[in-house]
């Protein structure tokens, strides 16, 4: 896939370094990521799509990809949504999308092999992973994600050198204390997950071809306008 890099860069107007506007968006992401970094079951938060590729527009939102602990995907999504809603930085719809956070892609740490949701010759998915910029990276979650996707021809030595320039520090002792504090809440949530969500999952699981929307116990993907096929055909033409 690396052979298509020049065409991909031209197609999306990707810059070698971020503009001042994009740097401010990264600073905003770092700021609000600190407000959620205490969540023990949050393993990685990364910027993806246009901002990670340095190809934003003045109306761009901030797309986030979030990795959670196994069986905690709905719990983490709930907390992040509430916190971002309180700070008024959650992208609810098109009317407030500019510069706000789009919480449209979550995955559990035990299901990071995206070859399962790739289309044939998935050029966009390759570069989506290639340019991913982690902000929160607990227990080497980003490295584990890359290792899980080597089947998609991802090569570590070809990743942009600045991919990890935006990672914020997370104090482990605070996470441990909060884990104890939230022990009961976690137990109660896991009880609901095991006894209620699993019963409902056959009815709630939803996958639209070609993986535009995925709602399951391990992946939540809410992009209802997936253009990967269109992008692939344009670049391969």
What function would you assign to each model-found segment?
Residues 1-59, 68-237:
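Catalytic core of pol beta-like nucleotidyltransferases
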């Amino acid at each position: 896939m690396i052979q298509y890099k020049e065409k991909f860069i031209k197609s999306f107007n990707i810059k070698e370094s971020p503009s001042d506007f994009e740097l401010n968006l990264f600073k905003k992401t770092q700021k609000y990521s600190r407000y959620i970094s205490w969540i023990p079951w949050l393993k990685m938060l990364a910027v993806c799509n246009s901002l990670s590729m340095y190809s934003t527009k003045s109306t761009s939102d901030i797309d986030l990809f979030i990795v959670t602990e196994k069986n905690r995907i709905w719990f983490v999504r709930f907390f992040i949504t509430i916190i971002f809603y309180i700070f008024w930085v959650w992208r609810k719809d098109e009317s407030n999308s500019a510069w706000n956070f789009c919480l449209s892609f979550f995955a559990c740490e035990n299901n990071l092999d995206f070859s399962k949701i790739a289309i044939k010759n998935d050029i966009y998915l390759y570069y989506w992973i290639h340019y991913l910029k982690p902000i929160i990276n607990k227990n080497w979650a980003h490295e584990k994600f890359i290792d899980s996707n080597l089947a998609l021809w991802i090569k570590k030595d070809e990743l942009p050198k600045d991919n990890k320039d935006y990672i914020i520090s997370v104090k482990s002792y605070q996470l441990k204390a909060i884990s104890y504090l939230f022990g009961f809440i976690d137990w109660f949530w896991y009880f609901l997950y095991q006894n209620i969500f699993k019963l409902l999952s056959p009815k709630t699981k939803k996958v639209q071809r070609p993986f535009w929307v995925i709602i399951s116990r391990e992946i939540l993907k809410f992009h209802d306008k997936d253009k990967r096929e269109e992008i692939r055909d344009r670049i391969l033409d």
